[in-house]
Regions:
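Aromatic- and glycine-rich beta-strand/loop motifs that create alpha-glucan
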Residues: 1-18, 225
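Hydrophobic alpha-helical transmembrane segments of multi-pass membrane transport/permease proteins
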Residues: 16-36, 51-60, 164-168, 210
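Secretory targeting signals
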Residues: 29-36, 44-51, 55, 97-156
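Terminal transmembrane helical anchor/hairpin motif
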Residues: 37-42, 46, 164-226
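Transmembrane helix boundary and interhelical loop/hinge segments in multi-pass membrane proteins
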Residues: 44-48, 63-81
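Hydrophobic/aromatic residues in alpha-helical transmembrane segments
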Residues: 60-64, 112, 143-144, 214-215
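Residue-level recognition of transmembrane alpha-helices
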Residues: 94-95, 130, 162-163
């Protein structure tokens, strides 16, 4: 599986995808950071990640839309399905590679934390809890994005399905408070308060695993009919 992770991770930088994702995220994050810190005099690093979660909603489809759809379009999926590697390892390899890109982006945000330390005394524990929540949110997004990519060979359609799903559950609580617990963004919003909500953490992990398993099932079925 390490070979798949290595191949997929490198592919993000052989193409502009990795650079575009990291670059756009940091540019947009910098804008929100500047507004919060220099306009509103806020030194709460964790609350800036509310904006980071919004940015992630728009950018994750860039990472995931070609994960499997590109393989189908170019015909290389046949090689994956007939290779000695199991479908499970292939899917997990793609998932982990995309997650590493987000993790690298998160590490880059420590620069902003250093700037806040110069202006004030941000809470390191709360910031770390926020980063954990952000990574859990990203993993949930990535797992669904890869699932969407597995059901179509068109990258654009995969991207539209992914972002459409995110926005549907983002705005769902606006119609009724009953749906609040179904919103991934709402679940993330508790982490910047410094609280690790076990129920939300379990939901993130369960959602991620479910999407990965569904992706494996989709690819296994496609393999069985070839």
């Amino acid at each position: 599986m390490f070979a798949v992770i290595k191949k997929e991770f490198k592919s993000y930088f052989y193409s502009p995808v990795g650079y575009v994702f990291i670059g756009l995220f940091l540019i947009m994050f910098s804008i929100f950071f500047y507004v919060d810190v220099f306009q509103y005099q806020s030194t709460n690093f964790e609350y800036i990640f509310y904006s980071g979660a919004t940015i992630l909603t728009f950018l994750v489809p860039i990472l995931t839309m070609r994960a499997i759809a590109e393989e189908r379009k170019t015909g290389t999926e046949q090689l994956l399905l007939t290779s000695p590697l199991s479908i499970t390892k292939v899917v997990l390899g793609k998932f982990i590679a995309a997650t590493l890109i987000v993790a690298i982006t998160e590490i880059c945000t420590f620069l902003y934390f250093g700037i806040l330390c110069y202006f004030g005394t941000p809470h390191i524990t709360t910031a770390l809890v926020t980063l954990l929540g952000f990574l859990l949110l990203a993993m949930s997004y990535i797992s669904f994005g890869i699932l969407a990519s597995s059901i179509t060979e068109n990258q654009i359609i995969a991207g539209v399905i992914t972002i459409g799903f995110f926005f549907f559950f983002w705005f769902l609580p606006q119609f009724s408070s009953i749906f609040t617990n179904f919103s991934l963004i709402n679940m993330f919003s508790k982490f910047p308060t410094g609280q690790i909500d076990i129920a939300d953490t379990v939901t993130f992990v369960t959602f991620t695993i479910s999407c990965i398993l569904l992706t494996i099932i989709v690819m296994q079925r496609r393999k069985s009919v070839r």
